Amino acid sequence: MSAEPLIAGVDEVGRGALFGPVVAAVVVTVPSGFARLWELGVKDSKQLSPQKRQKLSRQIQRDFVCRIGYATVKEIDRLNIFHASLLAMSRAIGKLPLSPSLCWVDGKHIIKDLSIPQKAVIQGDQQSPVIAAASIVAKVWRDDLITRWHRRYPDYGLARHKGYGTAQHLEAIGNYGLTSQHRLSFSPCQPRLEHDCRTICPRVIEIS
C-alpha cells in the first residue's frame, strides 16, 4: 500500500446557471498521481472543448476515485447559491469510500463541518490538477443532466446553453414561463415570476 497521503480535489459547476442543480465532483489521488493528470491534459474545464471534456472525464473516472454530489433547485432557492454549492461539495466528499488526508477546495472558502483537513485554493481549477480533474467530471455530469432535461423542455434551448442566462434562454423564459427546474431566487427569473403571480395569484383586497 502506498505511503503517500491521499489528496482530494473538489470543485462545483453551475453556480451561475438559471436552471438545474449545482453539481460538485471530488477526485482523489496521491501526489505522484498529479503527473498522470497533467499527462492526460487536465486543465480548467472551461478551457476544454465538450469532446475533450467527455474523453477526459471517462479517463479520470477510470483511473482515479471520483464521486458526484449536487444540491437541488429547491435547496438553491432556500439556502442561496453559495451555501448550496458548499452542500454539493460536502455531499460529493461524503460519498467517498476512503478518507483523504487533505481536501483542496476550489475558491476562497472551506466546507463547514467537514471532518477532514481542508485548504481553500483560489482559482484552484487552474492551479491544481486534482481540482481541475474534479471540475471536468462535474461539468460533464451536469451537462449530460441538463441535456436530458432538454428533452422534457425542448423550447428553452437547454442543450445549447446548459441552463445559463443566454439571450435565447431569457427569451424562452419570457415566452414560455418558468419550469420546475428554474431557480426562482435568481434575478433574471424574477420578472417572469412576478408576472405569473400577477396573472395566476388572486389579489388580496383589504376592505376597511
UniProtKB/Swiss-Prot annotation:
Its EC number is 3.1.26.4. GO terms for cellular component: cytoplasm; ribonuclease H2 complex. It is an enzyme of class 3 (hydrolase). The keyword Manganese applies. InterPro entries: RNase_HII, RNase_HII/HIII, RNase_HII/HIII_dom, RNaseH-like_sf, RNaseH_sf. Endonuclease that specifically degrades the RNA of RNA-DNA hybrids. This is Ribonuclease HII. It comes from Microcystis aeruginosa (strain NIES-843 / IAM M-2473). The gene is rnhB.
